[in-house]
Amino acid sequence: PLNSLPMSLNFQPSVVTSNEGGTGIGYSKMTVRGSKGSQINVTLNGITLNDAESQEVFWVNIPALGNILSSVQLQRGLGTSASGAGAFGASINMSTASVKAEPSGWVDISRGAWNTMTTSAGLSTGLLRHGFYADFVYSKNSTDGYIRNAYGDVQSALAVLGWMGEKNSLRLTYIMGNQHTGITWGGISKSQLEKDRRYNSAGEYYDSFGNVHYYDNETDNYTQHHLQLNYAHQFNQAWTWTTTLNYTKGDGFYDQYKAGKKLTKYGLSSPVEIDGVSYKKGDFITLKSMDNSYYVINSDLRYSKNALKV
């Protein structure tokens, strides 16, 4: 499964990856030389993707990221970063900037186990008269998942409008990621793994007769938009100035069934008496939402001549 970027990097030395659903679609994680995701500095077109609070990168927010990239650079070990926190475990630098000389288009459709399907298409105008160009990429992927409730329906899109002059360039980039997946982050014990490898406790509850049921809307939903404006000017063969403006907007929610939880945890008085029976615990359906914005201005002046780079 080579859908998300961590899964695509799985064959690199010192890289270990995992996917919660077992198909490569949905939540994926990676370690480099044993360092977890919060210790890996990740940039996209020079803009840091690491979450400001957890320092993690939620790869599921931009599904099928590999389809919209022109280059990926993985640097293992301790390193510095000009656009974010320093990297303890590794640095991953990704770029969507690639101007094609000729018009082109492509379509890729694949199907796999557990009703997994990936569909991607791209179109490029190539470099037009007066230096203008445009690129478009769209991907839609779906799966039932290997473990229970690991279904996924995710989409991503890229649109680039740009201009290249003799010493100047201007590029506007829009990236969208849309996620609708089942909750799979609970994990299982070793004994459960030996009994049923596809077991997932998400949404599990029991009725008064002891029969097991599953809440049918145990979902995680998130949409993220990235808008980047990049300007570059080359003074001469040694000096280059680049400036990038970035705005990231994300919003979503997850719906989750909580069984046997204390009433006081949700601000309710305890105990509660119903039909003569006293209760201190109950079952809850929780919906937690997120709405965040991220602004960045990144400006670099670079000098490069012979073996010296500053």
Regions from the PLM with identified roles:
Residues 6-48, 61-64, 70:
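Extracytoplasmic beta-strand/coil segments of soluble accessory domains associated
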Residues 37, 49, 97, 112-114, ...:
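Structural signature of outer-membrane beta-barrel domains
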Residues 22-24, 84, 112-115, 149-153, ...:
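Short sequence motifs at beta-strands and strand-loop junctions characteristic
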Residues 54-55, 74-76, 103-106, 140-144, ...:
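Extracytoplasmic loops and strand-loop junctions of Gram-negative outer membrane beta-barrel proteins
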Residues 11, 48-76, 94-95, 192:
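Short acidic/polar hinge/loop motifs at secondary-structure boundaries
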Residues 162, 169-232, 253-290:
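Acidic/polar loop-and-plug regions of large Gram-negative outer-membrane beta-barrel proteins
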Residues 104, 111-142, 147-184, 230-236:
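Transmembrane beta-barrel wall of Gram-negative outer-membrane proteins
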Residues 28, 88-90, 103-107, 117-121, ...:
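Hydrophobic, lipid-facing positions within transmembrane beta-strands of outer-membrane proteins
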